Amino acid sequence: MSFPKVIVVSTGSELTAGRSQDTNSSWIANELFGMGFTVSKFVVLPDDPVVILEELRTLTELSMRETSILLVMTGGLGPTEDDYTLEAVCRLKGVTTEESPVARQRIETFYKLRGRNFQEAMQTAIRQVFVPKGSIILNNSVGIAPGFITSLAENVHLGCMPGVPGEMTEMFREELAPWILKTYSSREQLYSGFRFIWWMSESQFQKEFISKEKAIADGKAIWGVAAKRGYIRASFQSDSRALVDDLLRKLDTFYGTKSTPDIFEELPRMLLEKKITIGTAESCTGGLIAKTFTDVPGSSAYFYGGIISYDNSVKTGILGVKRNTLDEFGAVSRETAKEMAEGALDALGVDYSISVTGIAGPGGGTPQKKVGLVYFGIGQKNEETEIHEHYFPFPRSSFREFAAHTGIYLLYDRLKRSA
């Protein structure tokens, strides 16, 4: 099948009302980019059956001008009365629904195990087990509602998944992505790759790296960049694997240790492979570093615990920070960060530790120590503790994310240098 025009559609009145952010679309686009597909358009729709139906009809009519269209849609497959995706697709195709036996079994098991009134609960929840008749069923390994793949026209395929991010990501990787690669296998192969560049802005990256790359200027490769908290994600795509690899090598050479893979995936693998244990001592980030680690399944194998030493009494009482250190240098200082990291090593009995202490704002700053100042300690058992100073003059929530991501990067960097 020919290379498709890809459109990502998200449904949910919470999205169109601005109450929630559409993180699904960006995640899907990133995954598709890595598979060699480029999304041409994002569409966000409210929970309105008429609007959903008309938009799907409009997108289907694009097939008269495009050789092939792939629609990837999320949301509207749940048990409530405002979940209209299934209804809209069935009306557009003029078909009825059919039951997914796997989903039916999962929902029966789900309610029986929880001791609920089974028959009463099923009256509402049973809506989730149906798909348009004749569809390819996408099994849901995390939740209940299945997704489905169906044809809206001869050259228009629609893949629908639940809007819950955890369910959607697993369904995409396990079910939809393999189908996409198989269905469009006759297309020209595209290759992609990416790096995180730490403490870098999009404009600076374009000026000092992208603008000097002839292959990009000549259109032999396309590039993209997304700003994150503490880093940018720079990506490349080309029909030449050698060219993508060459661009990544140039990135690594130009930016050195600031150029990394996805450390949020790589670091857990390193810790598991090397059987390294870690812990945290956090002040200004309030446990966000610990949360980031423990968001990963299986993290208990290497993450022993975290101490949120927000008050100085916790710094002294649990981490063993000296009272004299706090009096002379203050809670936000190199000296305190060092003693926090070393105290975490002892208190938690781990191989490595991360400490962080800073001024998140909006108050608390002084002419000598401004809001945004933050110190990190990277402790290693029986080795010298490393101290790093950074300055993130951003709103409180952004500051905390910058600091948390930076602390994780600093641990990754030390482990790489210690290898």
Curated annotation (Swiss-Prot):
<dbReference type="InterPro" id="IPR036425">
    <property type="entry name" value="MoaB/Mog-like_dom_sf"/>
</dbReference>
<dbReference type="InterPro" id="IPR050101">
    <property type="entry name" value="CinA"/>
</dbReference>
<protein>
    <recommendedName>
        <fullName>CinA-like protein</fullName>
    </recommendedName>
</protein>
<dbReference type="InterPro" id="IPR001453">
    <property type="entry name" value="MoaB/Mog_dom"/>
</dbReference>
<dbReference type="Pfam" id="PF02464">
    <property type="entry name" value="CinA"/>
</dbReference>
<dbReference type="Pfam" id="PF00994">
    <property type="entry name" value="MoCF_biosynth"/>
</dbReference>
<dbReference type="InterPro" id="IPR036653">
    <property type="entry name" value="CinA-like_C"/>
</dbReference>
<dbReference type="InterPro" id="IPR008135">
    <property type="entry name" value="Competence-induced_CinA"/>
</dbReference>
<comment type="similarity">
    <text>Belongs to the CinA family.</text>
</comment>
<dbReference type="InterPro" id="IPR008136">
    <property type="entry name" value="CinA_C"/>
</dbReference>
